[in-house]
Amino acid sequence: MKAFAWDEQKNELLKDNRGITFEEVVYHINHGDLLAKLDHPNSVRYPHQQIFVIKVEEYVYVVPFVEDKERYFLKTIIPSRKSTREFLKERKGDYEIG
């Protein structure tokens, strides 16, 4: 697999504001928690971006990235209720996850 890269300042902001880091994303990708690799849904505004969909514990995060020949450059980490429902097919109380 290609190398991963990111902006360290962005990583610190994500750690402080969302409680997750790019290192954790890479760990989960490397340990089988990658659920999908998708084209960015807004290809007009983000023409060269794709999205990793990863599972971290019982929640799904979307991680936009740009790919070149040597690496994946991770842009941000977004917790996603919608993706959690779409990708995790479990019943939890009255809510269906997935």
Labelled PLM ranges:
Residues 1-98:
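Ribonuclease/tRNase effector modules and their secretory precursors
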